[in-house]
From Swiss-Prot:
Keywords assigned by UniProt, alphabetized: Cytoplasm, Nucleus, Phosphoprotein, Proteasome
Gene3D superfamilies for this protein: 1.10.2020.20, Proteasomal ubiquitin receptor Rpn13/ADRM1
Protein's recorded name: Proteasomal ubiquitin receptor ADRM1 homolog
PH domain ranges (all copies): 16-124
GO cellular component: cytoplasm; nucleus; proteasome complex; proteasome regulatory particle; proteasome regulatory particle, lid subcomplex
Domain notes: The PH domain mediates interactions with PSMD1 and ubiquitin. Preferential binding to the proximal subunit of K48-linked diubiquitin allows UCHL5 access to the distal subunit.
Domain DEUBAD: 237-351
Gene from which the chain derives: Rpn13
Modified positions (Phosphothreonine) in chain numbering: 196, 205, 367
Source species: Drosophila melanogaster
Chain positions found as Phosphoserine: 6, 185, 207, 217-219
Length: 389
């Protein structure tokens, strides 16, 4: 989920899938207080297929909340504890955040139906066919990614070390397109049918290129990459790797035990887990449980497919990674992408570890974190440290 600053506030009521008059409520401490303004809660689906949960001020017409929501990430329900009004809450399943609304419709007979409809749209958004728009083309995913800010992309990936939003998005696309896609080489070889998420075309394992084949030239591939085009690339095109599923690399007990046996790896990974006072062995088990969880494995598999579809180039480019990593993402080469990430690490570091002590010490004074920490140091503490020296 993430918010947008503008874009859907001018939508006419006819385009809204559900709408009703309701005001916002503000939380102060453990209490929520009603905002007296007249408001409207509505849900709509944009052209890229994403669902929006919105609240706007009916007097000014300004949309103050515009949230892009993904299936299974939210729940909308009535607050039964409130006896003085009709209060509903939008619960974020991935965090403790809550948004409260108080009904402003004069009649109560449609409250339950509107609540049911909100949850239906949150968890089962209509497909393009249901909206009467026909089948969506392979450019939909790339169009959507190109129009996201870096902050939205970060939240789509669910933050560092998580990929909940991307998993939900690709899973939603997969449910809309149960049919398989055929990918064949330009030489006329047999097609390989693959079950893939909609708009994510995963290449089949390429065969050795024929000398007399009419495979696409490197210049043509580079031209399409530069134009942001190419929702798929020929299987025989240079720069593509074998179809790799990252989720198959970690499930083995030996691989996971090797990761958690290294204290540096454990320190790197636990920062991405919920805070806990568990002892070291319990934290290792928590890491192991997360890596082997179906949710993580599914997200990892879907990221593998998405990157190898050559459609994540615009996403990777916004994270200001190396040119090699961006080029690998545009070409859909997962192996080159991982190698590029390894090259960009500080000397002595690995994909799962940290720099050596000497390297870390040399780089610390230049990091923003260190500067921020110095700026926030208590002056009294500094004087005491100087006396001790």
């Amino acid at each position: 989920m993430f918010g947008r600053q503008s874009g859907l506030g001018s939508s006419s009521n006819s385009s809204n899938l559900v709408e009703f008059r309701a005001g916002r409520m503000n939380m102060v401490g453990k209490m929520v207080h009603p905002d007296p303004r007249k408001g409207l809660v509505y849900m709509t689906q944009s052209d890229d297929g994403l669902m929006h949960f919105c609240w706007k001020d009916r007097t000014s017409g300004k949309v103050e909340d515009d949230l892009i929501v993904f299936p299974d990430d939210f729940e909308y329900k009535r607050v039964d504890q409130c006896k003085t009004g009709r209060v509903y809450v939008l619960k974020f399943k991935s965090s403790t955040r809550r948004m409260f609304f108080w009904m402003q419709e004069p009649k109560t007979d449609k409250d339950d139906e509107q609540c049911r409809r909100i949850n239906e749209l949150l968890n089962n958004p209509p497909s393009a066919h249901q909206r009467g728009g026909g089948g969506s083309n392979d450019g939909d995913l790339q169009y959507m990614l190109n129009n996201m800010s870096q902050q939205q992309l970060m939240q789509l990936f669910g933050g560092v070390g998580q990929m909940g939003g991307l998993s939900s998005l690709l899973g939603q696309m997969n449910s809309r397109t149960p049919s398989s896609r055929n990918t064949s080489s330009s030489g006329g070889g047999g097609a390989s049918a693959l079950q893939t998420p909609e708009n994510v075309s995963v290449p089949r394992t390429p065969s050795a290129p024929s000398k007399s084949g009419s495979s696409r030239s490197s210049s043509n591939v580079n031209s399409q990459v530069g134009e942001g085009a190419g929702s798929s690339v020929d299987a025989d095109a240079p720069g593509r790797s074998l179809n790799i599923d990252l989720s198959t690399a970690l499930p083995g007990a030996d691989a996971i035990n090797q990761i958690i046996a290294d204290p540096e790896h454990v320190k790197t990974l636990i920062v991405h887990l919920p805070e806990s006072e568990d002892v070291d062995d319990d934290r290792k088990q928590q890491i192991k449980d997360n890596i082997t969880s179906p949710q993580f494995q599914q997200a990892l598999a879907q990221f593998s497919s998405a990157l190898q579809s050559a459609q994540l180039g615009p996403v990777i480019k916004q994270f200001e990674l190396s040119n090699e990593a961006v080029a690998a993402a545009f070409s859909g080469n997962l192996e080159d992408f991982v190698r590029a990430l390894e090259k960009s690490l500080p000397p002595g570091a690995t994909m799962g570890g940290k720099p050596s002590a000497s390297e870390k010490k040399a780089s610390d004074p230049e990091t923003p974190t260190s500067v921020a920490r110095d700026e926030n140091t208590d002056p009294a503490t500094e004087k005491q440290e100087e006396k001790q020296k």
